[in-house]
């Protein structure tokens, strides 16, 4: 997983390398995770469909909608960065 961003509430966002699904299509997983007193709040999306693969914890519907917006708007960039082996910062 490659790091993307860390939000003020402690949510960290990471994304995977490019993988192939059962139909031989290129996919990427984008994972949002926030530490809690009892573990983690987690949501994982699959690109390019932006469908939720996994959800656990106490993220609100508003937070999940925001995360979905992030992955939808960032879709081309996530693929570019995954091909590069992560985000390159000079």
Name each region found by the language model.
Residues 15-59:
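A short, structured beta-strand/loop element
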Residues 55-90:
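Acidic, low-complexity intrinsically disordered segments
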Residues 11-14, 38, 62, 77:
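A general, composition-driven signal for non-globular sequence regions
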Residues 5, 49, 68-70:
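Alpha-helical interaction segments
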